[in-house]
Curated annotation (Swiss-Prot):
Tissue-level expression: Expressed in testis and sperm; especially localized to sperm tail (at protein level).
Record's function text: Component of the outer dense fibers (ODF) of spermatozoa which could be involved in sperm tail structure, sperm movement and general organization of cellular cytoskeleton.
UniProt gene name: ODF4
Lineage: Eukaryota, Metazoa, Chordata, Craniata, Vertebrata
Biological process, per Gene Ontology: cell differentiation; spermatogenesis
Membrane topology (UniProt): Multi-pass membrane protein
Annotated organism of origin: Homo sapiens
Principal place of residence: membrane
Subcellular location: Membrane
Protein name as it appears in the record: Outer dense fiber protein 4
Record carries keyword GTP-binding: no
Phosphoserine modification, residue list: 64
Amino acid sequence: MDAEYSGNEFPRSEGERDQHQRPGKERKSGEAGWGTGELGQDGRLLSSTLSLSSNRSLGQRQNSPLPFQWRITHSFRWMAQVLASELSLVAFILLLVVAFSKKWLDLSRSLFYQRWPVDVSNRIHTSAHVMSMGLLHFYKSRSCSDLENGKVTFIFSTLMLFPINIWIFELERNVSIPIGWSYFIGWLVLILYFTCAILCYFNHKSFWSLILSHPSGAVSCSSSFGSVEESPRAQTITDTPITQEGVLDPEQKDTHV
């Protein structure tokens, strides 16, 4: 009987040991699972706060606090500035072409209505050739001492009164010389520069007229900027206690258990 009792006692003791050991393991596994649950909750809270902050920043970027009229004016001002810069660049390139061009006059289609001596005809050809070479070559062909006093008159007469000079030259020499394509490109350059000046003038005028006519819009715009800057801070302050409560709740549950 003792042997049977002893033989039966060992299995019972082993079972009891297993029963005593299993609750400890279950507690450990439960604690580990609870810890992972805490981490999962923290990760979800952090991801949710990050997604909310990113959505708010995108909304703030898309929804500008400026009034609609200010935004339209700003877009038109930017387009006018880009257009004026492009036109000025094109005009400068054409101006270089005109300055170094040698086609101010079309000498191949020149006609003489009177027979001149050889020396006079040669002089007419040389003067017409110099005039057809453009402003820079015409300036280089003369000595600087002769043009020091009348430099301004020379430039003005060459650029602005070129057809009048040609017409006087044709009347004096009784000859007809057609004007070349460089002269017309020069007028195109002048028109482009006038267009740039008009765009810049109206751009500046409309901008300041809008600011002077709507002074309250600037105040409301600045106040809206301040509210937009303050709102993310307030939202972050309100979000932080939520995350702290989410972290502290599991510890309170452990104490209650």
